Amino acid sequence: MYYSVERRKFAQLFLNKMKKFIVIALIAGAFFSSCGEFNKILKYADYEYKYEAAKSYFGNGQYAKAASLLEEVVTILKGTGNGEESLYMLAMAYYNQKDYITASHYFSNYYNTYPRGIYTELARYHSGKALFLETPEPRLDQSSTYKAIQELQMFMEYFPNSDRKTEAQLMIFSLQDKLVMKDYLSAKLYYNLGTYIGNASTTADGKINGNNYLACITTAQNALKDYPYTTMREEISILLLRAKYKLGTESVEEKKEERMREAIDEYYAFKNEFPESKYTKEVESIYKNASKYVKELND
């Protein structure tokens, strides 16, 4: 009886393993069969057949294979009835693989080749979105961010009534926030460097000012001017006030009063725009110290 039970357990275990082996074998067979079929298609000279195969692969979500075939036929199909579709599909194949730079290149190629094509609106939109998805973090070079903004703005100009206009505008706002963050980080770096001479700003005659606060002020002011509706406006404004005050404290005597007065003016501007700021205690302290210095100077 004991051996009978053990035999049944062994038989069941063996059957389970065999089932798994069969499933794996079937999957592997299908995979190699699919690879073999694709390699055969690559060797075909019939570009129409390759195009139909590419459409089939694309429809099944096999974008890498679709792209490989479309790369071979897209130039041949240019000027034919399938020219537009093949080029747009190639761009989408790369887009769906998250190869956004290549995708944007082909979307751009499409709308320049077919400015009134049936996919032109989608091509312009996806070209901008592809560049948007590829933009780097704020600390890095933002050249691609400017390019993405330009592409999305062009989309909105060409298709002002598009259903995708709102999404395009939101992407532009997001990209602008990234540029603001870049400026903010630069301004903050200048502020933190302070009087470090190795990276100090200079006067018109080439003399070292002995601080980086002027560079911080200029960078912060430009950010507020270029992006007046940024969500980081308060953070940039407090940095600007701090820099003006520190510039005043570090200035030579003949410039100190003027710069302290500029810090006081900045205080009023900050209080007017952010009356309930979380930095209220700090800005009041800056105002008190700057005012005290100016008062003592004129007593």
Each model region followed by its residue ranges:
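Acidic, polar-rich low-complexity tracts and alpha-helical solenoid repeat scaffolds
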Residues: 2-5, 31-299
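Sec-dependent bacterial lipoprotein signal peptides
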Residues: 2-35
